[in-house]
A protein has these predicted regions:
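Oxyanion-binding and handling regions
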Residues: 1-22, 35, 92-207
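DPxDG-like acidic metal-binding loop motif
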Residues: 60-91
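A general structural signal for well-ordered alpha-helical segments in protein cores
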Residues: 37-41, 76, 80, 176-180
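Phosphate/pyrophosphate-binding loops at sites that engage ATP/ADP/AMP, CoA/4′-phosphopantetheine
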Residues: 44-60, 140-145
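N-terminal phosphate-binding loop and adjacent alpha-helix
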Residues: 31-49
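Generic structural marker for isolated residues within well-ordered, non-membrane alpha-helices
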Residues: 44, 80, 97
Length: 207
């Protein structure tokens, strides 16, 4: 049994799959001043209960490793590592960039751009390209070779350079389903090897 979850982006997503069958998924949004990632534990608990399962039925965890909000990445990584360690589960980490690259069918090669701040964007073209300068990415976009999938801030920067562009936040999507589909093409790993991909490094206190 596979459990997938993501709190790194616009909502919390969780899903269950048994072999090739997706059993159930759930999407949780912010509630008032409470960020959606705060509901991850209860979301997983309710999802398992609804499907007459317990944590001991899970064999594999799939989690988003970022980039995204610091709070969301931390929630995903903490829950994934604790569950995997306590239940002896295999894990699969998938980047937000790869997830978003599958959110819609594109006419051309998808180029995913997420705001990395400091005049940079996290870029994906078949693989993670890293945080690249906005100006160099503008040159890449202007070749006309790509279908752009972005967040809202990158959409505002690049929409004047391409007609083939969409912000993923404006699309109907279920990232849990996408993660489950992607995971079928990946090898499982040990939880110790899950590495977060932060937009900015987390603060180091005491310096």
């Amino acid at each position: 049994m596979l459990l997938a979850f993501d709190t790194c982006l616009d909502k919390t997503y969780a899903g269950l799959a048994d072999k090739d069958k997706i059993l159930d998924t759930v999407i949780v949004e912010n509630e008032g001043n409470t960020y959606h990632s705060a509901f991850l534990i209860s979301c997983i608990r309710d999802l398992l209960k609804k499907n007459n399962l317990t944590p001991k039925d899970i064999t594999t965890l799939v989690t988003d490793v970022g980039p995204g909000s610091f709070t969301g990445i931390r929630a995903c990584m903490t829950v994934a590592k604790v569950m995997a360690q306590q239940l002896n589960l295999k894990t699969i980490g998938i980047s937000s960039l790869e997830i978003i690259s599958n959110v819609t069918k594109t006419k051309k090669e998808p180029l995913v751009l997420l705001d990395a701040r400091k005049n940079k964007a996290y870029a994906w073209e078949k693989e993670i390209l890293g945080a690249l300068p906005i100006e160099s990415l503008k040159e890449k976009v202007m070749t006309g070779n790509y279908s752009l999938i972005t967040d809202d801030s990158m959409y505002a920067l690049f929409c004047s350079l391409s007609d083939d562009i969409v912000s993923y936040t404006r699309l109907e999507h279920d990232f849990a389903k996408i993660m489950i589909e992607i995971s079928r093409q990946k090898e499982t790993d040990n939880w110790q090897n899950l590495k977060p991909l932060y937009i900015q490094p987390p603060p180091v206190f005491g310096r």
